[in-house]
Amino acid sequence: MKTKSTIEQNDSNKKEILADFKVGVDNVIFSVDTAYNRVFVLLRKRKEEPFVNWWSLPGTLVRQGETLTDAAYRTLAEKIQVDNLYLEQLYSFGDPHRDPRENPDCFGVRYLSVSYFALVRYEAAKIIDKSNYSVSWYKVDDIPKLAFDHDKILNYGWNRLKNKLQYSPIAFDVLPAEFTLNEVYQLYCTILGENFSDYSNFRSRLLKLGILLDTGVKVSRGAGRPASLYKFDAEAFKPLKDKPLLFI
C-alpha cells in the first residue's frame, strides 16, 4: 500500500525529470473548389507504424537548424505544387501520450506537434507526392478517422479558417492577381455556406473597405453582363491591418 509520503516522493521524482521533446509540424491544407462548391483537405496514408495504413495530415519532424515555418513550407512543397497560397501557424498540440511511441510509464520522449493551416484553390494545386505514400484530397464533410490526434487538429484548423475569413483578407492570397467580385463571393460561399450573406450586401461591404482597385478591365465569364476585374490593394490595407474588420 502506497503511503502519502511515497506518493509525494514519486510526484517529486517526476517533477525533476524533464521531458525530451521531438518537435514536428503537421499541416492542415485546405483547397476550395468554387466551381462545385466543395472544400477539401489533403491527407496522406501512413506506410509505417504507428497507425500503419491510417490517413493522417501531412507532417514532418523539424530538422536541425530549420524553423517551424520552413518545415511547414517544406512539407507542403513535397506534397503539392501551387503558386498562390495562405499559410499560418495554427496551434501547438502536446498532450502526454498523443503518440503511441511515448513510454506511458515515465517522462521520456514526447511528441509535440506545431500545426499550420494553409488555403489554396483546388484547380491551382497539383499533387506531386515525391514520396511512396498515398496522398489524396478528401472533402471536409467526408473525412475518415485520422491517426494520432489529427481529427482534433483538423477541426481546430477548419474553425480557424472560417473565422479568419470573416475578419481578414486571406481570400486574396489564393485568388488570381485579378479577380471579379463574384469570384470572391463564391469562395466565401463555398467555405462559409451559401446563407452567410447575399451578394449585394457582400459586394457593398467589400467595396466600402477601400482595399480593392478597379483595373478598368471587364471580362465575360458565363451569362450576364461583363464583370469588372479588381486587384487587392496591399498598401491601402496596411493602415487597417490592426483594426477590427468585418468582411461579411
For each predicted feature, which ranges?
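Acidic, metal-coordinating catalytic segment for phosphate/diphosphate chemistry
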Residues: 1-26, 103
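N-terminal strand-loop-strand
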Residues: 15-55
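Active-site segment of metal-dependent pyrophosphate-handling enzymes
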Residues: 21-23, 40, 70-73, 77-126, ...
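Active-site-proximal cofactor/substrate-binding loop regions of enzyme domains
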Residues: 49, 56-77
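NUDIX/MutT-family hydrolases
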Residues: 115-119, 126-161, 174-182, 204-206, ...
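Short helix-coil junctions and helix-kink-helix linkers
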Residues: 187-196
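Charge-enriched amphipathic alpha-helical scaffolds
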Residues: 195-213
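Long, intrinsically disordered, low-complexity Ser/Thr/Pro-rich regulatory/activation regions
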Residues: 214-248
